[in-house]
């Protein structure tokens, strides 16, 4: 079996990594940056260290802080217009998945005709575009180091998943010092998103030894440190360990692929503007229980990684404990336990079925699902 492991050219980790990145980029003389972020992050002062470092190096930049959760193609076009108007030369994304995905989509437009959603699917982006630095503030989507971007086509009310090595940032930055003030609910949702990445990658039909090692260690770290990061956001060790865990999960799914959890989660996220991590967290135990018969031995190893003492258990029993451990962690960090708590009704489901099955994440799922089975999974998640 052959496989590909694509990563950023440079990854910087740890407190102070933002300053290290700026010094590195200064030497490259890329020109003027468009900083793509969310206005709330600016108001919270999270970008102050970035601004100070850029100013110290006398590096030119323009701020685009209009990003919102679940970015749309219209937002991407707005960002690209800002890039052109300011005559920028490269991109710096600052935030979680939404700012980084927006910057990736803008990157597409710097070297390819629009819209960015035209490149939905795998390997359709012909030209790489300008350099991209991705500074991650959540743990998280791992968008700072993956080949994925998710942009909403508002007319069709669908999340378009763009997967291409040309979207991998040139420099990935995980600086835990800018993660300390992320609210508990966001910490919980993004952490469960990272757990979903790791588990889906581990049971994916595309899994291989390199992704297995990364996925299992990611599961172990997230299970251990996510509750601590939720309980005390200023626990720097917990934030750093979660940053490591989500990065390892990104390494795993960037090569092995994802599965039905993401395929199904993208639909309510698009139609109801729900947080991606929450959608994943609600669906994760339900869909992995559906997948379990096709990957019993693998789920037994997931249980071990989540701290379950499986000595004396059969793989079947241990695999069931993996599902229980997922549910326990989800409840522990305060994730809603059903979509009905978020304004979703049974009537919404029918419009999601075909889109979920057509999602690029679906083919790597270890157990194929029919349209009727997808409906039942959604109903169980209400």
Predicted features along the sequence, with ranges:
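Short, amphipathic C-terminal "tail helix"
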Residues: 345-382
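An N-terminal, well-structured beta->alpha segment
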Residues: 1-64
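C-terminal and late-domain segments of enzyme folds
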Residues: 184-248, 252
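A glycine/threonine-rich phosphate-anchoring loop and its flanking beta-alpha core
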Residues: 111-207, 298-305
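N-terminal small/polar loop signature for handling phosphorylated ligands or for N-terminal nucleophile
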Residues: 42-115, 123, 228-239
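Gly/Pro-rich interdomain helix-loop hinge
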Residues: 271-348
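Glycine-rich phosphate/pyrophosphate-binding beta-alpha loops
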Residues: 140, 247-280, 359-363
């Amino acid at each position: 079996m052959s496989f590909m492991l694509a990563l950023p050219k440079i990854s910087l980790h740890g407190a102070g990594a933002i300053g290290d990145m700026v010094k590195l980029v200064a030497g490259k003389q890329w020109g003027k940056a468009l900083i793509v972020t969310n206005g709330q992050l600016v108001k919270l002062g999270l970008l102050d260290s970035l601004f100070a470092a850029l100013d110290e190096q006398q590096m030119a930049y323009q701020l685009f802080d209009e990003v919102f959760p679940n970015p749309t193609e219209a937002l991407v076009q707005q960002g690209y217009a800002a890039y052109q108007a300011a005559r920028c030369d490269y991109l710096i994304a600052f935030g979680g998945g939404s700012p980084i995905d927006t910057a990736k989509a803008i990157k597409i437009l710097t070297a390819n005709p629009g819209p960015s959603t035209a490149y939905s699917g795998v390997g359709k982006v012909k030209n790489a575009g300008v350099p991209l630095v991705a500074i991650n503030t959540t743990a998280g989507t791992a968008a700072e180091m993956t080949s994925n971007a998710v942009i909403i086509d508002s007319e069709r009310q669908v999340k378009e998943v763009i997967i291409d090595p040309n979207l991998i940032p040139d420099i990935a930055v995980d600086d835990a010092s800018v993660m300390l003030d992320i609210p508990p609910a966001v910490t919980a949702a993004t952490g469960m998103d990272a757990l979903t990445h790791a588990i889906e990658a581990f049971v994916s039909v595309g899994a291989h030894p390199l992704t297995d090692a990364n996925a299992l260690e990611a599961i172990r770290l997230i299970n251990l440190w996510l509750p601590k990061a939720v309980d005390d956001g200023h626990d720097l060790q917990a934030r750093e360990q979660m940053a490591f865990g989500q990065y390892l999960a990104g390494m795993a799914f960037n090569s092995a692929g994802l599965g039905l959890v993401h395929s199904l989660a993208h639909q309510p996220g698009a139609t109801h503007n729900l947080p991606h991590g929450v959608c994943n967290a609600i669906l994760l135990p339900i869909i992995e229980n559906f997948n379990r018969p096709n990957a019993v031995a693998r789920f037994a190893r997931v249980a071990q990684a989540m701290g379950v003492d499986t000595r004396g258990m059969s793989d079947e029993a241990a695999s069931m404990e993996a599902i229980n451990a997922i549910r326990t962690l989800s409840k522990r960090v305060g994730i809603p336990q059903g979509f009905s708590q978020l304004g979703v009704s049974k009537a919404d489901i029918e419009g999601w079925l075909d889109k979920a099955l057509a999602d690029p994440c679906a083919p790597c799922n270890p157990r194929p699902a029919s349209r009727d089975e997808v409906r039942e999974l959604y109903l169980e998640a209400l």
